[in-house]
Amino acid sequence: MRLWSQISSCFTKNSFASCSCDERGHAINEGAGQILEALEEAGKEGYIVGGCVRDLAMGKVPHDWDITTSARPEEMLSIAASRGWKAIDGGGRRFGTVIIVLGGENYEVTTFRSEVYGSDAHRPSEVSFAKTLKEDLMRRDFTVNAMAMDRRGRLYDEFGGLSDIERKRLRAVGDAGERFSEDALRLFRACRFVAQLDFMADSSLVKGMESAFPRVSGLSLERVRQEMDRLLVSKHAARGMDLLVRSGLARCSCRIKEKGAYMEVPILPELSHLVGLPQQKEFHKYDAWYHTLAVLEATSPEPLLRWAALLHDVAKGMPGIRAIRKGRLTDYGHDKKGAEMARDILTRYRRSPAFTEEVVWLVENHMRFHFFANSPEADAEKWVRQLARDHVFSSSEAMAESFLHLKDLCKADIIGCGRPLSATEGHEAFGNYMAELSRRMPVTSKELHYPKDVPAILAPHVAEGMNNLLFRVQNGDLDNTEEALHEAALRFAKRHRD
């Protein structure tokens, strides 16, 4: 109880105002406190519950404040009306939830309830109101999410959630296999919470996962994708991904409904072969999977870079890629093959074409970036000119941003080989140089710095003339300046008149 005593010491009977952790620790915020007070005055039990209690116990400021109560939905609506509060029926009859709006914030107030699960892989088939707080806490997924607190700061911890927080351990409420079989999405939530909280999964939790794998086939792609995205942008995404892959969850499939029929969508089976895959020790400290996790951890927590990091070496060890040359393990072509695999994965995940193609470009070009960054004789400007001519990017700024992303990925790739941050200095300088080259390289005629009279000079061959000017600038035959473009336009017009 030592940890909790530090947190609850700032709670007083009549104080519900928010307070910063620097000044007084964390307390129940004003709106939640008012709701708990109103419930108590009406003779009802009321507690903050779930993630907000967990966050308080970890010294964090909760983002959401959920409340559980003995009051039925109609009673909660009556209490809200008596206080002049805005209240929304959030599925009261079925789920017992009323949403109270106070100070511009929404508070979900839910009646104590129990749940029975059936054929649906995620939603309960039957929800009934419970009589006690303990019954309500028993239905929750993990011990750290199954704690409640009253308005006076008293903690209700029936399942050892506080102890698990102190031990940085994620453990299921009761039997892990039963909890996962009830709601298969909890499998992905377990991976996410491990990543978000920097916890270790309890051995009982890991053992309980496999029995629920058949239920994953009934989960929607949308739900799984949401959990995956939240996992990947977590600070400790490597922990969560390691659990996802090593447990076997990555080899399962969810589903999507299209044209009236369900289609199977594999999670991420392509990653499984990387576990334990050896790499040439001269260049790599870790096997292919630990390397991938290290790269993932070394990138900034944004979806684009995290997906690129996760998939950048996905083709290593594949037939036709893995070979032994002169006694060394090699994976020549893994960047190109990996780009194809990344496109397949993100397409089946129904990611946007723009997002998919940028991840694909990063995966496909990460080895090329390493080569150019380490080869002073390589013609970097030629690379930029070719990209501009091939219309790979919509603008010069988009090309510059992509090179900065590629720089960050490749720096993480170096760190993931077990090398220090100082080893990335050359890549940092080269990436910034490539971004600057890109900003000076026009991708479309709109980025040519021509004077206003050039279109009139080129008429009636404006489109052809502009494309000619753009091509010459991209080839390095013409400067992108008003004077040079004006003279070139005059010469083009003269040739077409003659």
Which residues does each predicted region cover?
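Catalytic cores of the polymerase beta-like nucleotidyltransferase superfamily
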Residues: 1-498
